[in-house]
């Protein structure tokens, strides 16, 4: 079987609102194929807020 890896860093802050849902989809066009997600990870670094009280 052929295995593919997709890895991309995207600054989502520039494209989406503060609250979003993340997902994915796949297609082969008109043909049938089975897709297996063997690994999935999502990492977010949120800037902290400070209070001036």
Curated annotation (Swiss-Prot):
<protein>
    <recommendedName>
        <fullName>Lectin alpha chain</fullName>
    </recommendedName>
</protein>
<dbReference type="GO" id="GO:0030246">
    <property type="term" value="F:carbohydrate binding"/>
</dbReference>
<dbReference type="InterPro" id="IPR000985">
    <property type="entry name" value="Lectin_LegA_CS"/>
</dbReference>
<comment type="subunit">
    <text>Tetramer of two alpha and two beta chains.</text>
</comment>
<keyword id="KW-0430">Lectin</keyword>
<dbReference type="Pfam" id="PF00139">
    <property type="entry name" value="Lectin_legB"/>
</dbReference>
<comment type="similarity">
    <text>Belongs to the leguminous lectin family.</text>
</comment>
<dbReference type="InterPro" id="IPR013320">
    <property type="entry name" value="ConA-like_dom_sf"/>
</dbReference>
<dbReference type="InterPro" id="IPR001220">
    <property type="entry name" value="Legume_lectin_dom"/>
</dbReference>
């Amino acid at each position: 079987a052929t295995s593919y890896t997709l890895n991309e860093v995207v600054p989502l802050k520039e494209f989406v609102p503060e609250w979003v849902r993340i997902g994915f989809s796949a297609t082969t066009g008109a043909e049938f194929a089975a897709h297996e997600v063997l690994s999935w990870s999502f990492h977010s670094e949120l800037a902290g807020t400070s209070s001036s009280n």
